[in-house]
Amino acid sequence: MKKNVLIIGAGGVGHVVAHKCAQHNRKLGAIHLASRNPAKCQQIIDSIHARGSLQEPGILEAHALDALDIDATRALIRQLDIHIVINVGSAFVNMAVLRACLDTGAAYLDTAIHEDPAKICEQPPWYANYEWKYRDECQIIKIGRASCRERV
């Protein structure tokens, strides 16, 4: 079964992630991009089409989302039948997106540790401060210099 993907964040990393997902859309299902500015998501989608990044015809859609709004994120995940959420938005949204994934059963992939806006530059262990508290409840994958759970 193909897995529908929601990419949260439409900056530089979101652009790269969306193109990589498009290059593997034979294995993935629908690809959705969401950010506070859906026009940025649409620009990424347009660049995917312009470069011919899709392996085969597929669903690519842009959505407006305030990822700090757990209810809105949860609703979008359910509405689109999302299986995998790739969070490449601001580090301040990690816990809200993770909570929405826990509540919906979606797998959560991330590229950065969570930062609390009131506690920037916290002391290590950074992952243990936030995300690792939930590692037994869901699938959490960190992409980058460190990775936690290996369950997928």
Residue ranges and their predicted role:
Residues 13-16:
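Hydrophobic/small residue at the entry helix of a nucleotide-binding pocket
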Residues 36-40:
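Helix N-cap at the beta1-alpha1 junction of Rossmann-like dinucleotide-binding domains, i.e.
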Residues 51-69:
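Rossmann-fold cofactor-recognition segment
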Residues 65-81, 93:
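Conserved Rossmann-fold cofactor-binding substructure of NAD(P)-dependent oxidoreductases
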Residues 67, 84-95, 105:
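N-terminal glycine-rich "phosphate-gripper" loop used for MgATP/nucleotide binding
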Residues 103, 112-144:
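Rossmann-fold NAD(P)-binding glycine/threonine-rich loop
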Residues 143-152:
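Residue-level detector of conserved catalytic or cofactor/ligand-binding positions
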